[in-house]
């Protein structure tokens, strides 16, 4: 009886949280037209305490999307335009000597914001990229031998233009692996683009966005999402999917266990944001491509990673 009552209360809490997340999604749909799936993937990644790489051509709304997500989640937002002459101290912060006090004072850099947009990350030097990715992984930074904790939550959305090569430093595979998801907005659908031209620049909608939570609430949501039940059958399904990427003839190397764990965590968040306390196979399928497509390099003439990953989804049975 008590267990049943506790289960009812738990499901009620999840339902209320999911309703707030849906309210956030509705507002974002007025800002970014016709891209609901990308919005849902991004929100799921944040609920899973992951970071996102937005890879797309300029002018499709990447910056507006990031700003809108930060606003609707009530997070402290900062955009940094990466360039090849930026130093790690420009991002992390610096110690400044105060002669009147006879001591150094730490001035935190942009990385000490809850929501950081790292714009054009592939224009940053490898040293700066490494500093950011270390902060993403460790949730802390070290400056002059002293360690500083980053805020909770700490979310990085990085952007890059896949078509530009001149003056860029492509992220190595080991660093791409630090991003839970890679997403692409693509050009808007015809009707959405017509609406954009008719109604004007969507950035004017940004001041109208109302936060559905704050940093503390979002951290609690992340904790609840992490507690979503993941049955043995679901774990076996993820294992078979990951194993399928390691078969000869598809990719240079298959998915690592870390990638498999990212699929698990993203699927938990996907189930949570849809008001469920347990993961279904469809939740795993929903996040599979976004979580894995940037971690794999197809063998020559083997098709794109997305095509191959979709093929794996179609061939690996749910048992």
Predicted regions and their residues:
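Pre-Walker A (pre-P-loop) alpha-helix and adjacent loop at the N terminus of AAA/AAA+ ATPase modules
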Residues: 18-57
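Conserved alpha-helical scaffold flanking the Walker A/P-loop in AAA+ ATPase domains
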Residues: 41-44, 97-117
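C-terminal engagement/docking regions of AAA+ P-loop ATPases
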Residues: 247-319
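Conserved beta-strand position immediately N-terminal to the Walker
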Residues: 52, 116, 154
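Conserved AAA+ ATPase small/helical "lid" subdomain
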Residues: 208-263
